[in-house]
Amino acid sequence: MDLLAWKKATALAASVVAGSRMLKGPAVTATRSQVVRAAESIPANIAEGYGRGICGDGARFLTVARASAAELESHLRVAEAAGRLPPAAARPLIARTREVRYLVHRLLVSVRLRLSH
């Protein structure tokens, strides 16, 4: 797939999977699962939306991808605040998550504009 949003989301998901090994503290397995699922959901939903084309369903999957990016950012911020993820690991992932969310948002805006014409 040649979408920048998908490429960056895929790279982010791989980094989150690797970074999740640094999580520590109580309920680390549950936290790791939530973080990884949210991260992997982003490129998966971009791909599904792209696969459905310029239509309402495509836009819906891009909306889910954008929401998953917001969820991932929240999990990363909570993990950092709770001391479960070191700031040196959390902050770059948060910055990349925000970038991916912005790219997905712009893609969604583009699809919605095409749908309205």
Regions found by a protein language model. Name each.
Residues 1-117:
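Amphipathic alpha-helical assembly/interaction segments
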